[in-house]
Design a protein with these regions (language model features):
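S-adenosylmethionine/decaboxylated-SAM
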Residues: 1-137
């Protein structure tokens, strides 16, 4: 109901086991013609998209959050919003990092990148595992 007349939703899923499930529910949506589905590796799909996005939600491989951010940043106009999920990672971002914990290392690197990026305004909301809101200036 909140989707504007000319708006589109683009969604990426790497888990091919979810494809039938996702297609089933998208086909039931009154906005099904506005939903673009991509199945595969976001690191390959995102660079190929000739699109501009007003809102991006990142909830994927935590090791690659910084890479996803870099891939989408130039596809965002000023004022666009990025929502990054799990940025407090069950509190693990506050504990000493275990050398084998690549997921937490990825979240820490992402949080550091966002903190240092002067092109954006940002805030981490302490909701569940953390949600970071990032506005492009």
């Amino acid at each position: 109901e909140a989707l504007e007349k000319d708006a589109e939703i683009h969604t990426l899923e790497i888990n091919d086991e979810m494809e039938d499930f996702i297609r089933k529910y998208v086909s039931q949506s009154p906005d099904k013609d506005k939903i673009k589905l991509y199945f595969g590796d976001a690191m390959e799909i995102i660079p190929a998209l000739d699109e501009s996005f007003d809102l991006v939600f990142i909830d994927a491989d935590k090791r690659l959050y910084s890479d996803y951010y870099d891939l989408i940043f130039d596809k965002l106009p000023a004022g666009a919003l990025i929502l990054a999920d799990n940025t407090l990672w069950d509190g693990k971002v506050l504990e000493p990092l275990h050398p084998a914990d690549k997921q937490t290392a990825g979240i820490l690197a992402f949080n550091d990148k966002i903190k240092a990026d002067q092109r954006v305004e940002k805030v981490i909301l302490p909701l569940r595992d953390g949600l970071t809101m990032i506005w492009k200036k």
